[in-house]
Regions:
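Short, low-complexity disordered leader/linker segments with a strong preference
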Residues: 1-29, 353-359
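C-terminal lobe and pocket-closing loops
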Residues: 212-304, 352-359
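Extracytoplasmic "Venus flytrap"
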Residues: 33-51, 72-74, 155-161
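Hinge/capping helix and adjacent helix->loop/strand transition within the periplasmic-binding protein
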Residues: 24-32, 57-65, 81-92, 104-199, ...
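Periplasmic-binding protein-like
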Residues: 236, 301-318, 345-346
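Extracellular/periplasmic bilobal clamshell ligand-binding domains
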Residues: 324-359
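Beta->alpha turn/N-cap motifs
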Residues: 94-100, 106, 185-186, 202-210, ...
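Short helix-initiation/N-cap motifs at beta->coil->alpha
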Residues: 70-78, 180-195, 206-208, 326
Length: 359
């Protein structure tokens, strides 16, 4: 009986020490820098700027959360920088996107970062919408059968970035698209579209809602298709944020030159799954103490638990899930895993289409 008493007492002391450690995490008077490896005009910027003030409200001590931007090499510059960070006090964060995941998946030689070293504390899904200028949209009727002879111009962040999703989709649909390579973020692609330099574009959901929907309302842009969303069975269905817009799968099925049963679509879907359902992930650096990790996990969980969270996030980011703690780790695992045959197809296609060798 005395032994049992000692065990119970010891456990109580351990729990008390853990609670004390967590209580000691205090960001009062501190500034947390959340680095986004893109320009300030894209979807990742809107995502981080949405969460930053909410995170400030819910972290112990209510620190100032500042979103910083480090564009370059399609996000590889910022990710390589974050890999070298050794801050353990919770004042440095990083936000990745599909354009950070894809070069990692494809073995891009510029990648010097390792996702397994980082600590994911929150992840969220998103969608994507492709759109046309009004003149081209006159020939789009749910298929691209009447658009085969047209030439489009698209601002592309890089062949191995998230832009491979629209690039492969347009190729499968038989569209002749000229790619202007090396823009620093999708917001720059939207600016090209607005100025008339580009005639076709795509944006992630948050950027579309804020930057493109006004163009649609003014008659200056017309939605073409979304990439879709995944249902519980892993099937592509309409994006809940844009339920009236057909998916790429629907457009492909209706277009003579496109097939949803061959290796092209299998590869496209595999990279779509890696790039969108859990696209944006918030990380702390390697070596971050568990009590700091727990403080972030608790803060993001409190944000998600707000009674108005679904409403305010839908308006700014779209209707997509948010993952916290262990859920964020599972989301990361899905984002950095892709079938070997899909990877092989895409690397071969990148070589033939863009002259990019990853071997």
């Amino acid at each position: 009986m005395k032994t049992l008493t000692r065990i119970v007492a010891g456990a109580a002391v351990a729990l008390s020490m853990t609670a004390t450690a967590q209580a000691d995490v205090d960001f009062s008077g501190k500034t947390i820098e959340w680095t986004i490896p893109f320009s300030e005009t894209g979807g990742s910027a809107k995502w981080a700027n949405f969460f930053a003030p909410l995170l400030s409200e819910n972290l112990p001590g209510n620190p100032t959360v500042v979103v910083k931007f480090m564009p370059g090499a399609g996000s590889t510059k910022g990710a390589n920088w974050f890999q070298e960070q050794q801050h353990t006090d919770g004042t440095v964060m990083f936000g990745s996107s599909g354009s950070t995941q894809f070069p990692y998946l494809l073995g891009d030689p510029r990648v010097r970062y390792e996702y397994s070293d980082w600590v994911p504390v929150m992840a969220s899904g998103t969608g994507g919408v492709a759109y046309l200028n009004p003149e081209a949209a006159k020939k789009f009727n749910g298929t691209t059968n009447n658009m085969q002879g047209m030439t489009f111009i698209y601002g592309n962040q890089g062949a191995t970035r998230l832009d491979l999703i629209p690039a492969l989709a347009w190729k499968m649909l038989g569209l002749n698209v000229e790619h202007v390579m090396g823009i620093k973020g999708r917001g720059d692609g939207r600016k090209m579209f607005e100025s008339g330099e580009a005639t076709i574009d795509y944006q992630t959901s948050s950027s579309f809602l804020k930057g493109v929907q006004p163009l649609v309302d003014e008659g200056k842009a017309v939605p073409m298709m979304t990439w879709g969303a995944l249902d519980a069975n892993g099937q592509i269905v309409r994006d809940p944020t844009f339920p009236d817009v057909p998916t790429f799968k629907e457009v492909c099925e209706a277009t003579f030159s496109c097939s949803t049963t061959g290796p092209e679509f299998k590869a496209w879907k595999a990279f779509f799954i890696a790039g969108f359902p859990s696209q944006k992930i918030a990380f702390l650096p390697a070596g971050t103490p568990q009590d700091v990790i727990d403080a972030y996990t608790k803060a993001f969980a409190a944000i998600r638990a707000r009674s108005d969270f679904a409403e305010i996030s839908a308006k700014r980011l779209g209707k997509y899930p948010m993952y916290v703690g262990d859920e964020a780790q599972s989301a990361l695992n899905g984002a950095i895993t892709v079938d070997a045959s899909a990877k092989s197809f895409v690397t071969g296609w990148l070589q033939s289409e863009f002259g990019v060798s990853l071997n």
